[in-house]
Amino acid sequence: MNAYKGKITFNKEQCVLCQTCAFVCPAGAINISCVEPQKSYDFIIWHNTCTVCGNCTYFCPTGAIALSNTLAEATPQSEKYTSITANMVEYGECANCHEPMINVPLTMLKRGFKTISEPITSLFKLCPKCRRDHTFAKRAL
């Protein structure tokens, strides 16, 4: 099977809003902007601006961005911003205090832990403050 660099795909469930993809994109084809603080962000990819360099895919820590095998079509410069992928990445909420937080996808946990157990997944459903409090409370002093 011949694989080639194609159109960028985006999985908003995997995105942790680190904005690395936008930072490493030499063409400026990725824009992440706040819609409502602590609630949601717009994630936009301008396909006609993309040079298909693959930097976003390579540096994305969760695999939220991938290059597909669907060949992108060439379009005139006047249509530069017309072919887009737009998604809204929404914050989740802490299972304990219900404060807004960025969800930690399973792919990210698999990169950090050898095995994923229920205590680990439940711990990462907590915001950083509640996670610290929970971990500190479990320590024997």
State where each predicted segment sits.
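Ferredoxin-type iron-sulfur electron-transfer modules and their immediate structural context
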Residues: 1-39, 71-107, 123-124, 130-141
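Short, structured interface segments
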Residues: 59-74
